[in-house]
């Protein structure tokens, strides 16, 4: 009896696969006669699902753990690309991934006539497995009628397998894949410009070379551009672990911002944006800035808005420059929450830059500050004083672009697009806060959130001793505010919450006192127990409770 049941199961399974084979054979043979683009678009995804063994390493985005015996070899290979190359090479180039979209996204219907796109991917000495996994994920999870081409821009790679071997391999793929070779190491910005110039699609989609696109990633991006060609759209960027290549869904409740040092940062989506969307998390999020690695833009609009600043070097700052330019010049920037693309986030870069990473990024950031930030560039210069010594080249062409596009001032951007910015729109002072008694200055000591603010000899060089007393009566250093939560308690640096309370300080310009409103105590000099941190004491009017708020300027 058991044998009979077993035979029936085997026969049923075999019959099912025969029917699948027949279906695919008929489907392929009739594909050229098919007019329904949506039906054709099912082919790559269907083929990928049927062909995948979901029990293999890394399938469904699961972590790959390397045995102890191979740990030393794994560590050596890790140094090549600054991610676990051994784990990556064990994973199939077209591995399966979970559907991490919100439930409401899975049932959305998009217009039939969407613009097509060229996908531009820049690489330099990229690992074979991560580069090809990026390409396969684009091809397998994109409707082919929307995929004009994939353009791989080789930024002067030195590895042999990225030469003829790669050229021969991509010829076998079912979507046109073009390889463009840069004559010399040019960096991400100029390589992307080269790829964009060669593109034919109505939309350009930029991806990094170590990404994985998920099911339904492309249609929501293109649909939003179809609605408004001046909208630049980004997917939610999911995290691919650099250690295990585990695929982890990113949050739809964060958006892009930046701090005084012009470092891109993720911050919680504010309530005002949730209210604008009426609580519908499947609607796009308006974001002040983008991370810059992954986005789609109408090709003609990319030209109209000024592409990239070609005077910038290699990488860094181009994402904020483009973000400011889009918003200030009449466009909009959004995170489309129904689109998910994974990205390998590395703890360190494997690349070297001429002059060093810091020099390159400082030059790029100074260019964007000079062109787009108006008087608010002082926040950047004062907290990063070394930047003013960097030669940033000629920005006259970019300033002319701003004039021709009739772009709005940076104050408008802060007021209307990023009102919760870490840069206050109105403030009383920007510079040092000096104690009259000790002649020492408040100093953040390079400390992080939840740590005590310090006090140190004044050096007049900005940096860690730059604080802003804002019109909202906060004392800010970068994106942290001075906070006191209990009587005589320590002065802690916490994320600015803009709700006053423990972060509200009253400065008396006559008595020179800084009174904490909630505790009704005054900021005082350090105690004998710890001479490196200020204290909170009952207000007495003593010299030790007197502070000079000085505006600082640096020659630029």
UniProtKB/Swiss-Prot annotation:
Pfam families: Glycos_transf_2, Ricin_B_lectin. Residues 28-556 are lumenal. Disulfide bonds join 105-338, 329-407, 441-458, 481-496, 522-539. It is a single-pass type II membrane protein. The chain crosses the membrane at residues 5-27. Its cofactor is Mn(2+). Pathway: Protein modification; protein glycosylation. Substrate binds at residues 155, 185, 315, 346, 351. Residues 284-346 are annotated as: Catalytic subdomain B. Residues 428-550 form the Ricin B-type lectin domain. GO terms for cellular component: Golgi membrane. Mn(2+) binds at residues 208, 210, 343. GO terms for biological process: protein O-linked glycosylation; protein O-linked glycosylation via serine; protein O-linked glycosylation via threonine. PROSITE patterns: RICIN_B_LECTIN (PS50231). It catalyses: L-seryl-[protein] + UDP-N-acetyl-alpha-D-galactosamine = a 3-O-[N-acetyl-alpha-D-galactosaminyl]-L-seryl-[protein] + UDP + H(+); L-threonyl-[protein] + UDP-N-acetyl-alpha-D-galactosamine = a 3-O-[N-acetyl-alpha-D-galactosaminyl]-L-threonyl-[protein] + UDP + H(+). One of its GO terms (molecular function) is polypeptide N-acetylgalactosaminyltransferase activity. Residues 1-4 are cytoplasmic. Its EC number is 2.4.1.41. It is an enzyme of class 2 (transferase). There are two conserved domains in the glycosyltransferase region: the N-terminal domain (domain A, also called GT1 motif), which is probably involved in manganese coordination and substrate binding and the C-terminal domain (domain B, also called Gal/GalNAc-T motif), which is probably involved in catalytic reaction and UDP-Gal binding. PANTHER family: N-ACETYLGALACTOSAMINYLTRANSFERASE, POLYPEPTIDE N-ACETYLGALACTOSAMINYLTRANSFERASE 13. This is Polypeptide N-acetylgalactosaminyltransferase 13. It comes from Mus musculus.
